[in-house]
């Protein structure tokens, strides 16, 4: 994440604000990684999970702001919205239900996170920028595997 932050600082990004939205998102993603890696002796595991989830949720919302600043095309946004709805219908709803069954207090944070990931996927398509689309889809896939493993059952080799 530190290397990604350095890349964002080094790139010649359009518009003056874009760099700072993305840098803030990367810093929050780093914080999310740290929260999720904390040993049980350092912090309660459920609190650590919610703090990590919250950090990533805000980071993804900042990525969405950055993508909107880049510009979003209606046609591509429709395609992205269809992709995002498919993610919610196929995986998201089951992960949300699993979170509720595991601990009712996790229902709202996990649901909010699934929605933000879906919005990020849709918005990435809206930019029409392939690297952004691939990045958002990889985030969505990775987080789907994590959610599935945590709340439903183990994924082989995950």
Please give the residue ranges for each predicted region.
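Polytopic alpha-helical membrane-helix bundles and their juxtamembrane interface segments
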Residues: 1-158
């Amino acid at each position: 994440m530190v290397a990604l932050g350095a890349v964002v600082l080094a790139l010649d990004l359009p518009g003056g604000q874009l760099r700072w939205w993305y840098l803030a998102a990367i810093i929050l993603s780093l914080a999310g990684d740290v929260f999720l890696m904390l040993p049980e002796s350092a912090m309660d595991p459920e609190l650590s999970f919610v703090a990590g989830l919250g950090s990533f949720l805000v980071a993804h919302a900042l990525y969405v702001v950055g993508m909107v600043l880049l510009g979003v095309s209606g046609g591509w946004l429709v395609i992205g919205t269809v992709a995002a709805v498919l993610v919610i219908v196929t995986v998201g709803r089951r992960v949300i239900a699993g979170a509720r069954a595991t601990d009712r207090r996790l229902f709202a944070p996990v649901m909010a996170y699934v929605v933000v990931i879906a919005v990020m996927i849709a918005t990435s398509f809206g930019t029409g920028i392939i690297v952004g689309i691939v990045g958002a889809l990889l985030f969505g896939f990775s987080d789907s595997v994590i959610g599935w493993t945590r709340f439903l059952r183990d994924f082989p080799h995950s």
